[in-house]
C-alpha cells in the first residue's frame, strides 16, 4: 500500500476531536480540538486542516450503541461523514468509536478534554486494521 496521510474526526455537536496519522508509520496522534457549535466555523477549520495536511482519506468515528446498533448519535456521525465527502470530495471511512473516550481518559489520566485523543484512538484502530 502506498503511503497515505489520514485525518480522523471524533464528531460532537459542540467539539470535534482531530487526529493525524499515516500508513507508513501506522501511528496516529492527537492534533487538535475544534470548539464550535456553528457549522460554518467548524467546516472552515476543517477546510483549513484538509488544505494544510492534504489527507488521501479521512476517518470518522461512528457512535454506535453498546450492542453495536444505531442510536441518535450514529445518524449525526453518518451525516457529518457525508458532509465531509460532499463538501470536500474526500474519501471517508467510518470506524466504530465505542470505548474511545474512556480509553482516551485512561491515557490522559485526567479529566482534560479528550476529544483529540479519542480521534487518535479511532484512527489507530483503523490503521491497525490495515496492517
Swiss-Prot record:
UniProt-recorded name of the protein: Putative pre-16S rRNA nuclease
Source species taxonomy: Bacteria, Pseudomonadati, Pseudomonadota, Betaproteobacteria, Burkholderiales
Superkingdom of source: Bacteria
EC annotation from Swiss-Prot or TrEMBL: 3.1.-.-
Organism in which the protein naturally occurs: Bordetella avium (strain 197N)
Major subcellular site: cytoplasm
Function, in words: Could be a nuclease involved in processing of the 5'-end of pre-16S rRNA.
Family note: Belongs to the YqgF nuclease family.
One MF annotation (Gene Ontology) recorded for this entry: nuclease activity
Keyword Nuclease: yes
Gene3D superfamilies assigned to the protein according to its UniProt record, in alphabetical order: YqgF/RNase H-like domain
Disulphide-bonded residues: none
BP GO terms, sorted: rRNA 5'-end processing
Location in or out of the cell: Cytoplasm
Coiled-coil stretches noted in the UniProt entry, renumbered to this chain: none
CDD domains: YqgF
Pfam families: RuvX (PF03652)
Name of the top EC class for this enzyme: hydrolase
Keyword Hydrolase in record: yes
CC annotations in GO: cytosol
Keywords of this entry: Cytoplasm, Hydrolase, Nuclease, Ribosome biogenesis
